[in-house]
């Protein structure tokens, strides 16, 4: 489903589910299915413009955190009359090197769609990044901040 076809909250939820399925796959060849080439992204400490720059930033992050696995769950998705999607849920992250440790934080996603191709043109993700610091410090060779 292209974003420009979204007219109901159920359609918005299905679209957001696909977005997180694509992002959590870390299959960068699929990112263009849901993200516009002129994407503007802001989340955590990251702010970037352009799909290629967004992908390069994600690649750099995953290189610093090998074996990173993420998933996202949603408990509420809202669609405004202007077509902006608000999604509330949780972001989960774990590392292959520490499979028993999963960090879960509340998250809000804001997605503005391109009226031409229905892909996400602006994406903002709000979540507390601090709990992920402990996960990062659990990586081999990293020093815990005691």
From Swiss-Prot:
Pfam families reported for this sequence: SnoaL_2 (PF12680)
Keywords for this protein: Antibiotic biosynthesis
Domain of life: Eukaryota
Cross-referenced Gene3D superfamilies: 3.10.450.50
Pathway(s): Antibiotic biosynthesis
GO biological process: antibiotic biosynthetic process
Function: Part of the gene cluster that mediates the biosynthesis of sordarin and hypoxysordarin, glycoside antibiotics with a unique tetracyclic diterpene aglycone structure. First, the geranylgeranyl diphosphate synthase sdnC constructs GGDP from farnesyl diphosphate and isopentenyl diphosphate. The diterpene cyclase sdnA then catalyzes the cyclization of GGDP to afford cycloaraneosene. Cycloaraneosene is then hydroxylated four times by the putative cytochrome P450 monooxygenases sdnB, sdnE, sdnF and sdnH to give a hydroxylated cycloaraneosene derivative such as cycloaraneosene-8,9,13,19-tetraol.
Protein name, entry field: Sordarin/hypoxysordarin biosynthesis cluster protein G
